[in-house]
């Protein structure tokens, strides 16, 4: 009888409303569970990807005792207005929540859910502080469009270049080329739409604002969400291009929430996934085992029940951080991220000036240089950029790096390779590794693109972390820092978030290159960014002498 009642409840039809925004534009909104009667807590999703695609999840929430509200974003599918990426999502989110609180089926307590774009709009709405919003669950989401589009000053080219034609579709008689790579190599990159042959206002706007200026104000809520008193569940994968921002949101809320309640009621779940495989076991053909499986909806429901259900008494404690250890293929818990018990451990770069390729003399040891060592140099050629993955690999545009074997790329002369000795015992790394490098270039700008790699006894090499920094962004993203050709600079490259077991017999390796194409745009070396009409080769140097001791810093845990 209970099963039949549950099934009947889950089958109730949805209702569709045209919800008015403050400017009169009406947004198509599906409501699941309103006809069951009574006032209930409400879970809301706002999406540009078609509300009808979220019906299965909405029904799961409905079956769990919630009213589920799913809305097409402004200008998308059945909604009115013009779609401008994130430009109205703060106010539209506020207005929709306000509308929900006034409905007869709402008890005025609201949570939000969704990943990627629907996760980002949760932050934008939350930044407006709408009454009734009590909990959020953004999965693989950034509160800032700027930091979705750029990292370390480099444009996420495959992501943004691919999204441009999807948002501003080609006119009749034209179609988006199947292979955009040749177009990504033309200049100026800011005019990719002209190169393709039709206007793409969204792409051009993003590509012509490589600095965090006033253009981004409506789409950049990173600072505005500080001071919120709002429980949030953050779920993301290490290989996700939004990993850094998702984890950053958790860390900011833990530090800057307005109350102890807000600071304590944050949860981070970190798994071995990329943007399209959250909760799955296989990523780019690499099987992490059944333990990697995660039901995001189930995790969200447990979180929502804790804060929205009056008839649920949650357990006193919950793990604030659950993280999957790659190589161990097991979950661990922590009270914070990075884990407080992690100890920063340095590995210093060394060579006799020939660290080019994996067959070179680049090494890493726990000791810094005790005498002068020759610098390593490579020539970065925009006409022949280092690919982000080996030839033949087809990487989704929403990925920046994946667990794909890459040793063949380490045979290139324009890749510096530093390999530590094989481990005599297992080494557990968990947290936010970074590289501190002393560098120079004979040009007005350059990129330093890094990958941290697990080298197996067989010689296979799998990336576990990565980062990139454009030299003109070395002091931040608000205004450029000029680069004087030949001058030595100390830079810090954030290598993101990871947890992996470097097993006995495996070795840790650092790659340093001048590009990872097409994940990131190729630096023209002219200092003109996306407006460069030409490019040039550049010689990039890495130093590791006593006074210029380049190193990586690893957060290491005792096993």
List where the protein language model places each region.
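Active-site-adjacent alpha-helix of alpha/beta-hydrolase-fold enzymes
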Residues: 244-266
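Accessory cap/linker subdomain of secreted extracellular hydrolases
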Residues: 63, 124-227
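Short beta-strand/loop motif that positions the catalytic acidic residue
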Residues: 228, 234-236
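C-terminal, loop-rich substrate-recognition/catalytic regions characterized by aromatic stacking residues
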Residues: 183-187, 278, 285-559
């Amino acid at each position: 009888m209970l099963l039949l009642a549950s099934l009947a409840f889950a089958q109730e039809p949805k209702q569709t409303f045209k919800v008015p925004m403050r400017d009169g534009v009406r947004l198509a909104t599906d409501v699941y569970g309103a006809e069951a009667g009574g006032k209930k807590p409400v879970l809301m999703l706002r999406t540009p990807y078609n509300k009808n695609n979220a019906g299965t999840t909405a029904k799961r929430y409905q079956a769990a005792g919630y009213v589920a509200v799913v809305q097409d974003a402004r200008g998308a599918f059945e909604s009115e207005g013009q779609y401008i990426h994130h430009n109205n999502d703060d106010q539209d989110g506020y207005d929709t929540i306000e509308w929900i609180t006034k409905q007869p089926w709402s008890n005025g307590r609201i949570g939000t859910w969704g990943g990627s774009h629907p996760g980002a709009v949760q932050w934008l709405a939350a930044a407006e502080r709408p009454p009734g919003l009590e909990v959020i669950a953004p999965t693989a989401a950034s509160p800032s469009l700027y930091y979705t589009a750029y990292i370390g000053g480099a444009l996420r080219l495959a992501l943004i270049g691919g999204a441009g034609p999807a948002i501003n579709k080609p006119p009749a008689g034209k179609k988006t080329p199947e292979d955009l790579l040749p177009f990504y190599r033309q200049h100026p990159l800011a005019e990719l739409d002209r190169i393709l042959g039709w206007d793409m206002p969204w792409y051009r706007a993003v590509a012509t604002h490589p600095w965090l200026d006033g253009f981004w104000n409506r789409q950049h809520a990173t600072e505005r969400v500080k001071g919120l008193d709002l429980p949030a569940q953050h779920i993301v994968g290490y290989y996700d291009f939004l990993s850094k921002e998702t984890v950053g949101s958790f860390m900011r809320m833990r530090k800057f929430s307005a109350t102890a309640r807000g600071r304590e009621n944050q949860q981070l779940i970190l798994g071995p996934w990329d943007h399209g495989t959250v909760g799955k076991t296989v990523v780019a053909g690499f099987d992490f085992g059944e333990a990697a499986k995660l039901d995001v909806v189930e995790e969200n429901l447990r979180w929502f029940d804790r804060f929205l259900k009056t008839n649920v008494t949650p357990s006193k404690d919950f793990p604030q951080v659950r993280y999957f250890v790659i190589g161990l293929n097991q979950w661990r818990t922590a009270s914070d991220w990075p884990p407080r018990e992690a100890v920063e451990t340095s590995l210093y770069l060394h060579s006799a000036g020939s660290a080019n390729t994996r067959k070179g003399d680049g090494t890493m040891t726990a000791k810094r240089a005790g005498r002068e060592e020759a610098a390593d140099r490579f020539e970065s050629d925009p006409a022949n950029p280092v690919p982000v993955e080996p030839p033949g690999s087809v990487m989704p545009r929403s990925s920046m790096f994946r667990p794909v074997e890459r040793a063949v790329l380490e045979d290139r002369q324009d890749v510096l390779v530093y390999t530590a000795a094989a481990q005599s015992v297992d080494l557990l790394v968990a947290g936010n590794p970074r590289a501190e490098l002393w560098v120079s270039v004979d040009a007005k700008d350059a990129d330093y693109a890094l990958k941290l790699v697990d080298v197996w006894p067989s010689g296979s090499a799998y990336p576990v972390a990565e980062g990139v920094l454009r030299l003109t962004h070395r002091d931040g993203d608000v205004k450029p820092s000029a680069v004087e050709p030949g001058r030595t600079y100390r830079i810090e490259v954030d290598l993101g978030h990871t947890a992996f077991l470097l097993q006995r017999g495996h070795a840790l390796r650092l790659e340093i290159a001048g590009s990872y194409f097409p994940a990131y745009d190729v630096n023209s070396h002219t200092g003109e960014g996306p407006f460069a009409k030409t490019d040039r080769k550049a010689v990039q140097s890495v130093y590791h002498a006593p006074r210029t001791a380049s190193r990586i810093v690893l957060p290491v845990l005792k096993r």
